[in-house]
Amino acid sequence: MINRIHHFLSTSGNLLSCSENHYYKWRFGNIKYDKKGKGTPLLFIHDLTAGSSSYEFHQLINNLTDQHEIYTLDLLGYGLSDKPSITYTNNLYEQLITDFIKNIIGKKTSVVATGNSVPFVIMACHNNPEFFDKMIFINPQSLYSQNQIPSKQTKLLKFIFDTPVIGTFIYN
């Protein structure tokens, strides 16, 4: 009952819906994105915190549509994109960004990334420089802190959260 009330209250404003939503059928699920404006392409990548989505940029993008073709997307597992039961890694998001630019935008693109999304944007640019023009980072995290190998404790916690009964109980 509490979850239903919480769901109703959190979705009553319908903040993520938009008449201009598009979906990119990627190999791990449908990726929701919006496209506005004309000019040089500019892709916005949101942070990886709970509750993040392309909605983070809704006030900013209208100021840029005169000179740029703006793309905002909800990363896999966020916003209105699919949320498959897989392990989300920087490599997964690197592939998503590269495939999105290659298959949807189709030309060299400038990217604006925030917070924890910065490392996989850097990796994507390093591995596929032909798809990237400029990179703009907002509040980037330390690359050192993002380059840590999971400890035994972290692996144990992931195992516990992935266990159907225990993980579902903890999340709900």
Feature locations, PLM:
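Structural signature of beta-strand start/N-cap positions in the alpha/beta core
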Residues: P41, E69, K108-S110, F131-K134
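Gly/Ala-rich beta-loop-alpha elbow adjacent to hydrolase catalytic centers
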Residues: A113-V121
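Short beta-strand immediately N-terminal to the catalytic nucleophile in serine-hydrolase-like folds
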Residues: V111-T114, I138
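Conserved HGGG/HGGXW glycine-rich cap/lid loop of the alpha/beta-hydrolase fold
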Residues: R27-G29, D34-L80
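An N-terminal hydrophobic leader/cap segment in hydrolases
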Residues: M1-Y23
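Active-site loop/oxyanion-hole signature of alpha/beta-hydrolase fold enzymes
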Residues: T72-V112
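Conserved catalytic-core motifs of eukaryotic protein kinase domains, centered on the activation segment
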Residues: S54-E56, S81-T87, Q146-Q148
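Flexible "cap/lid" loop of the alpha/beta hydrolase fold
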Residues: I122-N127, F132-V165
